[in-house]
Amino acid sequence: MAITVYLSCLLVLSMAGLAQGIKSSLRSQDPGPQPLELKQAFTLFQIQYNRSYSNPEEYARRLDIFAHNLAQAQQLEEEDLGTAEFGVTPFSDLTEEEFGRLYGHRRMDGEAPKVGREVGSEEWGESVPPTCDWRKLDGVISSVKKQESCSCCWAMAAAGNIEALWAIKYRQSVELSVQELLDCGRCGDGCRGGFVWDAFITVLNNSGLASEKDYPFQGQVKPHRCLAKKRTKVAWIQDFIMLPDNEQKIAWYLATQGPITVTINMKLLKLYKKGVIEATPTSCDPFLVDHSVLLVGFGKSESVADRRAGAAGAQPQSRRSIPFWILKNSWGTKWGXGGYFRLYRGNNTCGITKYPLTARVDQPAKKRPVSCPP
């Protein structure tokens, strides 16, 4: 742990001033202003994230990608209206295409199935608390998972949703099998991608879900290897519902019922490190959603300097508080703030209101005994 923190500090120090120089050189098509410093930063990146390359040509290619990503990180930070910081992450040697292929949905976008329903107006409350963080209640939110090169964010988000709701309703912590959702799904496409409702349909079809311990994550799917019938179920769902695309209602449901899943545009997450992302529809298209995560809370930041102060009509040196959502990702704890990130709350940042989906958990229904009359 100490070595990792030390390397992170070295990376931050080495990035100071380097990104601006690289950004300027890319504009002028110059090979690079400070190649030695860039290579030193890249070496630190390789050590921290255990990267090695097969030949000098591949090394040179990844170094060039790293330089472009470093310049892009600075540009993203300059354009962001919140408090987000961007920089070197585990994905800094990947192109946009590689990143999207490995971590986003690969299936074509589709409509949610008719099984889910929107909650009726009679079920909505009016009062929403100022803050909510389900991580603070022991046993509700399981550890941050790492999907590796398997495009299974949809399955991990669904499993996390059921785990949290089960713990809240029955006061029983469970860690559920993502692998069962991948191996046994009839609608999802395993490690090639899927949607959260695919996972919920699988749980309904299989009459429950096994534990992670009993059916562990492999990060790959083999044909005809579904073991659902051979594994004991530890959690069940009654159905699943699609919430309205209204952030106030989503906040109320989250605070009163528990964590839900959302599917967002992950464009700005590749180089994200910490802070609140406040994007515009131009910088993060809310209609192009490609990554499912678990929404675990919301809050409001302390007063911070307004990055919008340079905009027309804004007061210089003004300060403001920023409302935000708290989201759990599936890229491991070395990404973001321990595997979590925050999005601005109130303007459908990155499409967070497009598919707010949640299961509703319940014990399996007991069949009434039937006997023939004498």
Curated annotation (Swiss-Prot):
Keywords: Disulfide bond, Endoplasmic reticulum, Glycoprotein, Hydrolase, Protease, Signal, Thiol protease, Zymogen
Any Gene Ontology biological process: proteolysis involved in protein catabolic process
Cleaved signal peptide residues: 1-21
Pro-sequence residue ranges: 22-127
Keyword Signal: yes
A GO molecular-function annotation: cysteine-type endopeptidase activity
Residues bearing carbohydrate: 205, 347
Name listed for the protein in its UniProt record: Cathepsin W
Organism expressing this protein natively: Felis catus (Cat)
Gene that specifies this protein: CTSW
